[in-house]
């Protein structure tokens, strides 16, 4: 199975998608979800530190999980139901 990475041109539809799923937030929790097979899709913030996003992106390739990019950390955090920014999140349902 091939991994599909993309930067979306329809940011709002991706953020709506995030908000409709149960998610884990943060690099450490996301890595655990990938390793356990619970992650269904990963979301990364464009303005997040590449030191955080690049290893997660590599893990997505390793585990054959789609990876979508969202406009910024604050929007990703809000879509996940938290009031602070998030560099990474994963849909787990």
Regions found by a protein language model. Give the residues of each.
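Ribosome large-subunit tunnel/peptidyl-transferase-proximal elements
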Residues: 2-38
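A short linear-motif detector with a strong N-terminal bias
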Residues: 2-3, 21-23, 45-47, 66-71
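A short, structure-level motif marking secondary-structure boundaries and short turns
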Residues: 15-16, 40-43, 91
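Amphipathic coiled-coil/heptad-repeat helices and related helical stalk/stem segments
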Residues: 26-27, 52, 72
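Fold-independent oxyanion-binding glycine-rich loops
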Residues: 27, 46, 92-93
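Short, flexible micro-motifs
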Residues: 29, 40, 80, 84
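N-terminal positively charged helical leader segments and presequences
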Residues: 32-58, 64
């Amino acid at each position: 199975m091939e991994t599909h990475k993309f930067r979306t041109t329809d940011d709002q539809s991706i953020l709506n998608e995030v908000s409709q799923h149960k998610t884990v937030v943060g690099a450490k929790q996301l890595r655990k979800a990938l390793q356990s097979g619970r992650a269904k899709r990963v979301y990364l913030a464009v303005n997040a530190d590449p030191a955080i996003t690049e290893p997660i992106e590599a893990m997505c390739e390793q585990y054959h999980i789609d990876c979508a990019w969202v406009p910024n950390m604050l929007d990703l955090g809000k879509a996940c139901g938290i009031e602070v920014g998030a560099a990474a999140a994963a849909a787990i349902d």
